[in-house]
Amino acid sequence: MKHTEGFLKIVEDAKTRVREVDVPHTLERLKTGARLIDVREDNEWERGHARGAEHMGRGVIERDIETAIPDHSTELILYCGGGYRSALAADNLQRMGYTNVYSMAGGWKAWKDAAAPIEGE
């Protein structure tokens, strides 16, 4: 998908405040209790997702996160299709007071390219 200039501008702005991690780092952090959150749309999730991930779409994560994960110090790693929407969501969660939030660089594409475990595909 080709992204618009305006969208890329807000993503780049968010990325100045958001820490990114790669797939190998994500896999290591999951072993120690980090929570992996897929922020893609429902139809994307249903076509396949990272094994063990939780689904909270980009349109509802800010509304639902505090009920699902009330501890603002929980380590959260967010991913989307390519790392753009997850950066925006991570930025918002930080603004909500979550202190240990990351965006997975490259998103679902990077996860699949790394042959990391998947389910639902």
Q: Which residues does each predicted region cover?
A:
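Rhodanese-like catalytic fold shared by cysteine-dependent sulfurtransferases
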Residues: 1-35, 42-75, 82-121
